[in-house]
Amino acid sequence: MLRPQLNPSSSHHHTTTTSSSSSTQLYFASSSCIASLRRPSPPSLIAGAGCRTTRRRQQGRQRVVVRCASSSAASSASEAARRGTGSSDMAPAAVVKVKAVATIKVTVEGLLNSLRPSKAIDNIRDLIGRSLFLELVSSELEAKTGKKKATVHSYAHKVDDDDHGVVTYEADFDVPTGFGPIGAVVVTNELGQEMFLEDLNLTAGDGAGNSTVLPIRCNSWVQPKSSIDEGTPGKRIFFAKAYLPGQTPAGLRSYREEDLKQKRGNGAGQREADDRVYDYDVYNDLGNPDSNGDLARPVLGGSKQFPYPRRCRTGRPPSKKDPKSETRKGNVYVPRDEEFSEVKNAQFLLKTLQSVLHAAVPAAQSALIDNLSLNLPFPSFFVIDKLFEDGVELPGVEKLGFLHSIVPRLLELLRDSPGDKILLFDTPANVQKDKFAWLRDEEFARETLAGINPYAIELVREFPLKSKLDPAVYGPAESAITADLLEEQMRRVMTVEEAISQKRLFMLDFHDLFLPYVHKIRSLKHTTMYGSRTIFFLTDDGTLRLLAIELTRPASPSQPQWRQVFTPSTDTTKSWLWRMAKAHVRAHDAGHHELITHWLRTHCAVEPYIIAANRQLSEMHPIYQLLHPHFRYTMRINALARSRLISAAGIIELSFSPQKYSMELSSVAYDKLWRFDMEALPADLVRRGMAEEDPTAEHGLRLAIEDYPFANDGLLIWDAIKTWVQAYVARFYPDADSVAGDEELQAFWTEVRTKGHGDKKDAPWWPKLDSPESLAHTLTTIVWVAAAHHAAVNFGQYDFGGYFPNRPSIARTVMPVEEPVDGAAMERFLDNPDQALRECFPSQVQATVVMAVLDVLSTHSTDEEYLGGEQTRPWNSDAAVQAAYAGFTARLKEIEGVIDGRNKDRKLKNRCGAGILPYQLMKPFSDAGVTGMGIPNSTSI
């Protein structure tokens, strides 16, 4: 059996991609014809009975030539085709033998279901060959009536069941020679349980040993006919080829429309786990008011106060206490094909299990944590170090309670851990390089360019620094950072005016974003907040020097505004205050990173693209097939985030400074900062002043800091994506009219703007899809955000944040010098500044929970699909698309070498030097695990 190389773990339906003018295609003609595996026009033909097939080599290509030997046979076939009869009605001389091979992946759930009584019925169906009903669909209509041609149908019978959970079914068809091209296969699951259909391969032979295979990649769940709701079609269709809407063969148009209609749903009712319906809703499921009034949260999206992207509608009933909110009962629905593959799911559950034990078991299983009080600080830095030196033993199975049933399944995967201490935290990579790097100002500054939040730093373009907030509410707009103070810290080498003109001053500006929430956050227990500004100076060797930190508390009815500027100092007291000020800024940056750079810009903002694509782009649409790999697992991980991470009393609220106001802050950031046109990497760099357009420079940009590892490597990836997408778009859209006239494409983009991001629908900056160039740029931006942007801010989280003093998620105490000064707190600070800093850091529980979560989020699964990888190659596309993708893959491999070379270049001090972690987050490929590199196709964790 001839089969294409497929990814066996993907959980998505993806049809074979080919152009409208060429493909491997099964075509059954009624007159003289030629079939070729080259790219002829008209498409490839496989002739009917009475034809003779030969094979030739021509200019390095294999060519199959089929010539009709009998005109009478062709005439007979033509008459049979006109009758529209299926295979059972065909005369033997007027048919072509076609074999279909269906590959089914058996899941662990399926194996468990094999114990059900209904399995016996399924076995009987397998035995008599009535498990899977397949129908071949012609691309043509009946010439006389203009109606659909009758499908050619057959039951598939089980022929193989291997040791790897793959079951093979085969079906034989007698296809009329006048049937025309096979455009699709309709599948009906006659078994009592759902099945995961990996692929279908149709083989047509001439009886002389020559054959042509038409592969159809499915990777989709097919529900059993018995479980389909009344009124819902119980069949699934899988298309054989990509077509733009206007080029869709007449015989497939109604199928195309019906499949889209099914995925849109009717906007009513509660969605079930086996549905494949995509629809929109606001974020009204983050709170849980029915459980506790303190867990109520505002609805995000659909209002001027809290604008937000939309998420997938679940249809769960409204809350009893707040009808605007949705109840949180049961699992969060995502369309069936958006679920994790079982490999991904098992590994995610394994890591989550380890994480739960990391966070909860230490109290009983080690001497690490003697008190699980949420607010207990670490007693010493020595104890922090023991997180990586002493393991936490896995308790006996009998002590695991509800985990008892799943641990035996996972223990096999844990056997490679050293001894019994299988829950040992791995030492983060930056600590392995330099245990004390977190104390150095140089590392603090370097991580703004080569850490996990390289999107925050910006150029200082005016001085004095001024707030845009209302001074009547928040105090004087002008910053307390003076020119004299900065010039002193710059060692008087130049004036502030000169530094600005030479683009030597840079800033982390968390002032206006956080200041309006300072008092709200301070009203909560065991956390605090400031508005902050942090200033850096670009030295002659291309590194940044940390100059000053300004912390601001706005005025309140009971207190005046307080603000103070902190600087590096050799004075002992001031140096400890400096360390505490840096801890506050690091916590601000951690919140900005997790809530905005990571969650909002990659997870949350991408979900509307996925929903709109599935509602408006047919799965046979070339743009759907281009984008689909970049949407893998995103909806599922977002649903998990809503359930566990960003929900009321979830991990984010537990562990980050804004606590219950975390998601509100992300809504404020969406309102003030998010723009689609600024999500492209070049536009983002220019917006922050980190680059300026220069047609003579590489990538058309001149960076403000030459050694900016994220920008330098990221631009290589951006250009590679752009080149690939431009080639793909050019293959299908020759001119502006072809883009503007694509009704599915235009409906997709309209829905992204007016529904998915409906709170910004009238913004003037939305691009128009009116040319191949604008389409390619828009698609490049989507791919960049889903793949490279996410990789840059996700897969280094454990390396940089696993040792939490380097990147505390929360600052829990105010500065000891904040007025009015608490005399007792000041005395404790002076007596034991080390303890004061540890009390400001996350508590033991907060730190270990965050460490465990960052470990999970930073992990690549074994079934990861990487940018430019072989798993998502457009398998059956024409030569132009195949060559473009091969070039894309080759370029990404070249980029890996370029990045390796840069990391060894000692002139690049922001990525090479003693104790410095090399910048590898933009390296495209990776092994499984926590590696600090690798760009998956999608925002998949």
Curated annotation (Swiss-Prot):
EC top class named in words: oxidoreductase
GO BP, one annotated term: oxylipin biosynthetic process
Subcellular localization, as worded in the UniProt entry: Plastid, Chloroplast
Primary location: plastid
CDD domains: PLAT_LH2
Annotated catalysed reactions: (9Z,12Z)-octadecadienoate + O2 = (13S)-hydroperoxy-(9Z,11E)-octadecadienoate; (9Z,12Z,15Z)-octadecatrienoate + O2 = (13S)-hydroperoxy-(9Z,11E,15Z)-octadecatrienoate
Cofactor(s) it depends on: Fe cation
Pathway note: Lipid metabolism; oxylipin biosynthesis
Compositionally biased intervals (Basic and acidic residues): 319-331
Entry's family note: Belongs to the lipoxygenase family.
Role, per record: Plant lipoxygenase may be involved in a number of diverse aspects of plant physiology including growth and development, pest resistance, and senescence or responses to wounding. It catalyzes the hydroperoxidation of lipids containing a cis,cis-1,4-pentadiene structure.
Protein name stated in the entry: Probable lipoxygenase 8, chloroplastic
Species whose genome carries this gene: Oryza sativa subsp. japonica (Rice)
Gene this chain is encoded by: CM-LOX2
